[in-house]
């Protein structure tokens, strides 16, 4: 495996373990040339899934888009990269279990929001504001009230 820091091909695996949901192998590696450590994930290749956009266009499913959106929502929040990676794995697993070769962006957005709600409420509101295209302050207030109602319901 090529080192992302110095480009050397001389790296070794320090630790290998399956992810919590079992869909990937997480490997901790060390470069023999520069000594830096990095993490890689090994996944099986799946049949291509197409994402149906709002305007009807179709494009190949890209888990990196989901991960990047979640990273953006979790920016400056106490959420680790590993937590985001596991959430993305759960989203991909749910989509795979649903068994469709086409999935609407709406479904992906709902799954991302479910995961973010569990991880961090501020990240959830950030993502919701973009995903639901908030244009008014009242829309933010409504989603915050919804979170508060859910939290109060859990405490009872």
Curated annotation (Swiss-Prot):
Q: Which UniProt keywords apply?
A: ATP-binding, DNA-binding, Metal-binding, Nucleotide-binding, Repressor, Transcription, Transcription regulation, Zinc, Zinc-finger
Give the unnamed zinc finger regions.
3-34
Q: Name one GO biological process term.
A: negative regulation of DNA-templated transcription
- Signal sequence residues: none
Instruction: Output the Pfam families linked to this UniProt entry.
Output: ATP-cone, Zn_ribbon_NrdR
Q: Report domain ATP-cone positions.
A: 49-139
How is the cofactor bound, in the record's words? Answer: Binds 1 zinc ion.
Which cofactor does the UniProt annotation name?
A: Zn(2+)
Q: Has UniProt tagged this entry with the keyword Zinc-finger?
A: yes
One of the record's GO molecular function terms: ATP binding
Q: Read off the InterPro entries from this record.
A: ATP-cone_dom, NrdR-like_N, RNR_NrdR-like
Domain of life per record? Bacteria
Q: Which HAMAP family match?
A: NrdR
| Protein family (similarity comment) | Belongs to the NrdR family.
Purpose of the protein: Negatively regulates transcription of bacterial ribonucleotide reductase nrd genes and operons by binding to NrdR-boxes.
Listed name of the protein: Transcriptional repressor NrdR
Protein's organism? Thermotoga petrophila (strain ATCC BAA-488 / DSM 13995 / JCM 10881 / RKU-1)
């Amino acid at each position: 495996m090529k080192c992302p820091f110095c480009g050397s091909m001389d790296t070794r695996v320090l630790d290998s373990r399956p992810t919590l949901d079992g869909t990937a192998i997480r490997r901790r590696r060390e470069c023999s040339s520069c000594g830096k450590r990095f993490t890689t994930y090994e996944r099986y290749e799946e049949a291509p899934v197409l994402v149906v956009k709002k305007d009807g266009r179709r494009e190949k499913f890209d888990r990196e888009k989901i991960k990047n959106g979640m990273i953006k929502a979790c920016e400056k929040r106490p959420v680790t990269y590993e937590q985001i990676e596991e959430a993305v794995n759960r989203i991909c697993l749910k989509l795979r279990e649903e068994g469709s070769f086409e999935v609407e962006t709406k479904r992906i957005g709902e799954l991302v929001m479910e995961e973010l709600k569990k991880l961090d409420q501020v990240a959830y509101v950030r993502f919701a504001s973009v995903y639901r295209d908030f244009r008014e302050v009242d829309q933010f207030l409504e989603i915050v009230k919804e979170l508060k109602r859910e939290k109060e319901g859990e405490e009872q």
